[in-house]
Amino acid sequence: MLLKVFIVDDEIAPREGIRSASLWDDQNFTLVGEAPDGEIALPMIADEKPDVVVTDIRMPFMDGLALSRAIKRSMPWIHIVILSGYSDFGYARQAISLGVEEYLLKPVTTSPGW
């Protein structure tokens, strides 16, 4: 079974990096959409109903925490992974309190041995 993934990040480079990662073929993931911020992403996520949303934490219009809150309220089955350039524990604590499954610091690598 393919897991559907949706990416939300205001920067193009992280979206391209995730999109081009080798994990898609190896782990049975399929990319179903992407958006530059939470405000644009939310209706797209409601339409696509992905299994996993990978989101940045700081974005214009609707940040990753607000997006996570909205997703968990209306689509609680969706797993959320936050990618953040901020190591401030306050962001991680907020994410955990919202039910976010993973909080990873950028840059993220898929290479073995990390």
Predicted regions: what is each one?
Residues 42-114:
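CheY-like receiver
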Residues 8-9, 35, 53:
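Conserved sequence signature across two-component system core domains
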Residues 1-4:
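Non-catalytic signal-transmission and effector/linker regions of two-component phosphorelay proteins
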Residues 6, 30-33, 102:
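Structural signal for short hydrophobic segments within the conserved structured cores
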